[in-house]
Amino acid sequence: KLKKEYEWLKEVDKFALTNTIYNMDAAYRKFFKEHAGYPKFKSKHDNHKSYTTNITNGNITVDFKCNRVKLPKLKDVKAKLHRSFSGQIKSATISQVPSGKYYVSILVETEHMELPHTNQNTGID
């Protein structure tokens, strides 16, 4: 409904809009139930610009050989990948810092491996 009225909303990834609504809902729930302060935009002195998008049908991919990240509504983006990972990608948060650079933080689900119990104690002074 809003996308018909505001055409520019079609340019934005739908999960970015959905996550924004979830964040706003959580802020109002805390305000009414946990007696937190009234939710307000913190953009007066905060230059933190970011959004989070979720994965669906493989719309977020990382190519370690070509150093590229595929994000929804964007082409393949050239990236400096600092470490490799294995597991299923859950979401990606894209941030712009005040210098104008962009950073992508990728949330990955991996299997939890428990360490074996050794029955030895270690003391640290």
Predicted regions and their residues:
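Nucleic-acid substrate recognition interfaces
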Residues: 1-124
